[in-house]
């Protein structure tokens, strides 16, 4: 049985917004955070160079949250990327907030998905309309989204579909055709661009990547 932490707080009413707030956030945001649970967390090591990512999978009453911090070298320059992805209970992407800090300063990207339409910092990106999943170029976390959503049987293929791919360090959003084939209980073959890129993926009980062939390796995990 999980432990429940009871929080008592004084609610202040903001004079500027008129919205009740607790510790600087709205009541709705406070309630969501108070009832969230970290399902899994871990560390991935980048195998193509210098890089680490700390990751958390969080469950709330209504959403799944994928949250990570990436430290790496981009063009021999230190870079830090942070992201937070909100998905519904069926792992369909709802929104994402991404920030990147490097020698060029800090940049931010806000993505929203609404009924098959994708918005990039408030502007519709028609090139990725119809996509269901977001795909982060610097992280193996988002491979979990189609794996969870599709629930493939062993030997079954997803067929080709388009993901909304976030390129790093450009922080641009573009379509990426891809396909998943379930090879075994915890193993998948991932391919993109019609087979131009192929890699084997090994997952854990939560369908999080433990080994992304040649690119990422999970070095620890907690549940």
Predicted feature locations:
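Solvent-exposed helix/loop surface patches that form functional interfaces
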Residues: 28-54, 108-189, 193-194
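Beta-turn initiation residues at beta-strand->coil junctions
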Residues: 70, 97-100, 122-123, 192-193, ...
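Short N-terminal edge-element motif at the start of the domain
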Residues: 41-86
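Hydrophobic/aromatic-rich structural module bridging two neighboring secondary-structure elements via a short loop
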Residues: 75-121
